[in-house]
Regions:
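Conserved, mostly hydrophobic/aromatic
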Residues: 55, 107, 160, 236, ...
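Glycoside hydrolase catalytic-domain groove-lining segments
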Residues: 147-166, 262-263, 267-383, 400-408, ...
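Short Pro-Gly-centered beta-turn/loop motif in secreted/extracellular proteins
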Residues: 89-102, 467-477
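Beta-strand-rich domain onsets/edges
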Residues: 19-86, 106, 119, 125-126, ...
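Hydrophobic faces of well-ordered beta-strands that scaffold small-molecule active sites
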Residues: 77-79, 104-109, 167-171, 245-249, ...
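Aromatic-rich peripheral "rim/lid" segments of glycoside hydrolase catalytic domains that contact
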Residues: 22-24, 29-30, 187, 191-194, ...
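Aromatic-lined substrate-binding rim segments of carbohydrate-active enzymes
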Residues: 100-104, 111-216, 227-228, 233-239, ...
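Hydrophobic h-region of N-terminal signal peptides that target proteins for export
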Residues: 9-18
């Protein structure tokens, strides 16, 4: 794949030039994303993503040639790896896997409770026959398999470790009944008499009760929910410790907080998802905080990107929760939104202009944490020639703007392959076709990550072997010849001004 990525460079370069005024986008769009705006994006990228390196290569005469090559990014460019071994042919799987370590330096591993633990007490850590490539290659209707997009955890983790990339676990706790919360929680652990009480009340009757009244009505299930939530967190922490570098501890709970449903001391939360343990976000962070090593980052993640989410994070931290990273999402699931953006029209998502993006991120940054754009979707409307160009232009301009945000630590693309999303997600939001043919959006992203945002320089040494340059933060390899003509190499990490050899 490395050769393929570089081999596509000419096409990627042509695409980047065309995007300066790509006719797929309207004049109204380009007025919003004009040269002055692009220069401001560049200025912020230089300010926030680069640092000044200072090298002293002892014994190197003045004027000697020094080659500087960035070999990895400090910034996280990720994608989920939910389709691991599931694409139907060895060639497709190979192309998919080769993206991790070339384009992506991070992978999000699926730990959705509902499919991770299909039966209580039987988490799917290890692969079974149904998790093998052979099983999926023979599968005629993969989307209807119960574990579609939910590979067993350990093979995906081991693969990412073999590539030397960062791993992100998603999620530990989430109230969503469709995607995460197992039915067996209620079916197996709510006693028959308590089930009968709930069914007799019905949804409307239950809604009239206070959390305290509900907890009194179903005391056993209230305790069992809390116990099983804690058990899940403990199992994941004990299994992976420091192998997985970060976790979405709680996913999409800010709506409950914004509605006043997260009440300290309550035994039950009347979540918009359904019944949850009381103050479940606080409880989750209190549980996992002592379990994971300090070098494992504990994230909160949400689709809300407003003051309510910032207030939630500040509240949790004020109450003693260790939260290291604040995750935010931007799913342009509706292809019409991408068409509207291309036509210069305004959509409800805060991505209409760079200034709107910066303002939104400034709101989240008030929590004082690094930001992770944890789930990104940009569709190619109709997936025709124009639609794919729209996707590519939006990808380039949005990634550039997000990359320019000071507190941003990473961006994670969601569905890498067309027609491989969850039911209800667009089938045309991939960087690749279903057959793993690269789309223009892939070339646009690859051009940024592996070309424009990687520093490669040939410099001349100054007096006393001193070499200075400004480059993107990350790991560098420096090559030179000493006074005797022997080849020399050294590596260093550029994280702040003054770093070097």
């Amino acid at each position: 794949m490395k050769h393929a990525v570089m081999g596509w460079g000419m096409l990627a370069a042509a695409l980047a030039l065309a995007q300066e005024q790509n006719p797929a986008m309207s004049d109204a769009y380009w007025k919003l994303w004009n040269p002055e705006v692009q220069r401001e994006i560049d200025r912020r990228i230089d300010q926030n993503r680069k640092a000044d390196a200072a090298l002293t290569l002892t014994g190197l005469p003045a004027g000697a040639e020094v080659k500087v090559e960035q070999i990895s990014h400090a910034f996280i460019f990720g994608a989920h790896i939910f389709n691991f071994k599931q694409l139907g042919t060895a060639e497709r799987n190979r192309k998919y896997e080769e993206l991790y370590g070339t384009l992506f330096n991070s992978a999000t591993i699926a730990f959705y409770w509902k499919k991770f633990e299909l039966e209580p007490g039987k988490p799917r850590f290890e692969a079974e026959e149904r998790d093998t490539a052979a099983y999926w290659d023979a599968c005629k209707d993969p989307k209807n398999e119960i574990h579609w997009r939910r590979p067993a955890a350990e093979p995906a983790v081991a693969f990412c470790e073999s590539k030397g990339i960062r791993l992100h676990g998603h999620p530990i706790i989430w109230g969503n009944r469709k995607w995460h919360h197992p039915e067996w929680l209620f079916e197996t652990f709510c006693p028959a008499d308590e089930k009968e009480k709930i069914l007799k009340l019905g949804k409307e009757g239950l809604a009239k009760l206070t959390p305290a009244q509900i907890a009194e009505l179903i005391p056993v299930y209230t305790r069992e929910m809390k116990r099983l939530f804690e058990k899940r967190a403990v199992e994941l922490a004990q299994r992976y410790q420091g192998r997985i570098h970060s976790w979405d501890v709680v996913n999409e709970s800010a709506t409950d907080f914004s509605r006043g449903l997260m009440v300290p001391g309550d035994a039950i939360c009347k979540s918009h998802y359904g019944l949850m343990p009381g103050d479940y976000t606080w409880q989750a962070f209190q549980t996992v905080g002592p379990l994971f090593p300090k070098n494992v980052k504990l994230n909160i993640n949400d689709y809300l990107n407003n003051e309510a989410y910032t207030r939630q994070v500040n509240d949790l931290r004020a109450r003693g929760c260790r939260i290291d990273i604040m995750g935010t999402q931007m799913h342009l699931f509706n292809p019409q939104d991408c068409l509207k953006l291309a036509d210069g029209q305004t959509i409800s998502k805060p991505v209409n202009t760079p200034q709107q993006i910066w303002d939104t991120m400034d709101t989240l940054a008030k929590a004082g944490l690094p930001l992770h754009l944890s789930e990104i979707t940009i569709t190619s409307p109709n997936n025709d020639a124009r639609g794919q160009q729209i996707q590519a232009v939006l990808t380039r301009n949005l990634y550039r703007t997000w990359f320019s945000v000071g507190p941003m630590m990473g961006i994670t693309w969601w569905n890498v392959v067309d027609d491989c999303g969850a039911p209800g997600e667009p089938s045309v939001s991939g960087l690749f076709s279903r057959d793993m043919a690269p789309k223009p959006a892939f070339h646009a992203m690859n051009k940024l990550i592996n070309d424009e945002w990687k520093t490669r320089l040939t410099l001349k040494a100054g007096a006393d072997g001193k070499v200075a340059f400004r480059g993107f933060k990350g790991t560098y390899r420096v090559s030179w010849k000493d006074a005797a003509g022997a080849e020399k190499q050294a590596e260093f990490r550029l994280a702040k001004d003054g770093d070097g050899i």
